[in-house]
């Protein structure tokens, strides 16, 4: 085991604070409408330019191990804010820095760290309740656009495209962000249920121009197994042929004789048919087949539940208004499933999302909800260069998370005003002793830090602005972009309540732990002994001089 270096008391806290300040100072220059960019060097390719707080924080690793511990703890604040709310990472970092700096001053003055922490926790819990009371529902498209614009660093084009995407696919719809090919942003909306499986044979194509299969009012046969024997399919094919309607087969696979016979029947015009593989793998495939069955009013033919393909009737088949199949994707539009059944399925998947532990599972379940409930929108980010593209994509993703958070928990006045109003409501809060009261005052002072930093980045006098905003009421605040005081909600400067709340909670949580630190332990750098001597060459006996 390597030898350890240990620091105690003030020595430890000073080093930790230095690390906190180095990281926070690099992150906080990005805050607000006039925040600056940070350039991040990469080991390969061009440097990355960003205004995303968590991207800056993740890049910072300090040489001094004690300083690095402080920096890593603040990095944790930014990462947690990003994971929970998807935005507010810079605000959380600024709050954590303010609480740690104020708190450690009180510790140096002889206050009890544990009581300070209890006071801070008490103030934050009260402030969170006040934030909830200040919160307004985010219901209109204009408000969604404003939240997106603010989160994308006052880029109104981003706010507009996110609001448009939400309008088209609904609040539950999936919105994804991709790198586009054009110079401007594009919005691509897929209505209905789309999954990433294309036709099994190009001979199914009936629209030569687009190279796709278009089926009008088809029956949909859902099978949870491989189909290789055509005899199993004959009863369903005959029933569909009599009804003179097309058929889409979605199965684990269709191969050999079965696929060849379907192709021949299709080409001869006996029955208009197409086959695709079922989406997903394993249990996820079974679940998605069931989703399609509920959406189209059909039944999954599965031997697990005692249903045989030979005995399938028209009643077992799903139906839709239209199906479009390309080489890569299948889209089912207007399935005839009952609305109550679809809503029940959506509620069931939502419950699974709450119970899921991995982000990957949550994302996949959320996609299934969207496919059942609304649709999928893809925002394709446009830019002139790859460096600009990456920077803009980061901002669009932040803005998208912020708008989702706003829809979920509502909105409060932006620009750091909500925290100042929450602090002013709890100014009379008392702890159990004087040291807890100091902790409460530390938290209240720290809650001004985001407004002060936004003002400082805009090149204005932070104390003057903070006093003016404190003297106001409600959503009265300072628009750093224009240098004007006024109603923040009317000026469209909004923050999602969830973002502000989680930034404060995570900052206080980690800062409280740092204030109560009394010792720090790290590995001593190992002394490098260099390469060992190679030693002389052994004698080569028997080789006398000639």
Swiss-Prot record:
Tagged with keyword Secreted: no
Gene: groEL1
Pfam families linked to this entry: Cpn60_TCP1 (PF00118)
MF terms (GO), sorted A to Z: ATP binding; ATP-dependent protein folding chaperone; isomerase activity; unfolded protein binding
NCBIfam families linked: GroEL, PRK00013.1, PRK12849.1, PRK12850.1, PRK12851.1
Swiss-Prot/TrEMBL catalytic activity: ATP + H2O + a folded polypeptide = ADP + phosphate + an unfolded polypeptide
GO BP terms: protein refolding
Protein known as: Chaperonin GroEL 1
Cell compartment(s), UniProt: Cytoplasm
